[in-house]
Amino acid sequence: YKAAVFLIENLPFHYSYEGEPLNNYLKLFELHGKGTMYPDKVLDSIQRACGPFHLDRLEVKSDIHIDPDYLIENIEWAFKVWHEQPWGKNVSFDDFCEFILPYRVGDERLEPWRERIYNKYNPLLDSIRGLPEAEDPKFVSQILMDTLHSGPVYFTGLFSFGPHYGPKVVDWRSGSCVNFTDLQLYVFRALGLPCSEEIMLMRGNGNVPHYWNAAFDKDGNSYRCSILDPTSELNTPDSYWDPKGKVYRRTFSLNREMIQAMGKEAEDRHPSFRYPCFRDVTAIYAGSKNHTLTISPGHFYRSLKNDEPVYLCSATFLDWAPIGWCLYDKQLGAVFKNVEGQVVFRLGTYENGKICPQSDPFLLDRESGEVRFFSSGDKEVEVTLLHKYELYFEPFVRRMVDGVFEGSNDFHFRKKDTLFIIKEFPERLWNVVGVNSDHAYRYVRYYGPKDSYCNIAEAAFYASSADSIPLTGKIIGTPGANGLDGSHEYTNVFDGNPYTSFDFAQPTGGWAGLDLGTPHCIEKIVFTPRNRDNFIRTDDEYELFYYNNGKWVSAGRVRPHSDSLLYKVPEGALLYLKDHTRGKDERIFEYKDGKQRFW
């Protein structure tokens, strides 16, 4: 009875998207889940066949209209697995209600799922069900996580413009982090294992939200896990290194305490906090780096009323998204409890349906908890820009470290000389290095380091450091490439296109080179790392913005003729570089010690 009341009381805060266009949207995940097409090809194929998807053409159906039989069946199955499994005795009723009982995981179209998934996965636990350790849900969760983690992953964020797509994710294993979080929720809950969805409303170092799971032990302690992680291990929350700012745990129940504390009507709260079905768990993720953030009244753009809600906002492209809140205090200003650093924030208030800036951006130091503001001064500095996005998210550039350029007069390179070794990952599109060798070579090549898949986009060898035209010859190398369409062969390294690349089929042993026909001296090498097109691209139209007095100010538009941009901007300003021609990977940064530092 109490479980039914729990669900019914919270029905008004949940809903589904329904309608015929939803079927076409689901086809994206189904086709991608076959593993035979790249995501962009899947999207193009479905859009050609079905037309573009529009979320606003779907019907929003409140759960207050839920089929009573569906609800009853869900409750009966949830109680069945809770009571029959040996670990169920160590799952509290409250955790059962929040993390096993719910009939949905998001805004997906409702359909029966418990019995089907139970029948598929429950037999996998037969061998351990009789063990004493099976009374601890963490022990069983680890066994199940090992199984889920071993399956195929068809990851893409390209389809993230629609609702959750429901229990079919268990079969298709296709989508983004939110979809793989759903997958784990369905399987764990179908077997009576408590499992939650953990949320960053906005990544601390990215422009989008992020999702993962938490499993629980017999004492109710939670452990971070994700099918998308490198390993299947259940880890303590404070071992999660990603900059987070704030972390929330999705619940089925409405956080009525949060609403009461805010003291505002629903329409006067930002939509992210209008009907919050989540609770703040930042403290367990931040651990020893958990901070109380205080911004004094002197840092506000204007004076606020006492107890006015102030939102802690994180950057998303050129905008700012609320990820936390507190009530303004005329004496102290804004005091936010439980905040993790290494994130740039800005304060705002919610007025007339939008967030109004109330402070300059500032960085909260992760270790010390100290605050550093980005304030545009009168002094200008010259900045040299090489990319528009953090190179940490360009995984391929690091694969060039310890890569080596070699010369030889033996086709098999049994006797070879080292021309240059890459000691640091490249930070720009075109990298020029000098060669100190008096010998002449007929054969030259780039040999990739261990576990690099010989990732490289371009290599060019020059007889003289003054030459602008590279040497040419017959392309040689190790055949075989990763991918579905053979588009990443070694021949790409000499096609003159920095956006095609070599991705060798094996992690080690790959190389790409030239047979120059006759021996040549080599004085210069120019190379380009395999990349995701976030370096400065010749002739694209770029615009640099700097943050000043609550808004982004343009420093001008330019079309570069090289792989760098030069601007003059106020010293100490927060910056953002936009490519108006193509792409979407862009992020706030500062210019410090002669380099771009992204946040």
Region roles according to the model:
Residues 351-379, 589-599:
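Structured interaction patches on ligand/partner-binding surfaces of diverse proteins
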Residues 307-327, 406-416, 420-421, 532, ...:
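Short amphipathic beta-strand segments in non-cytosolic proteins
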Residues 281-282, 292-307, 392-395:
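Structural motif
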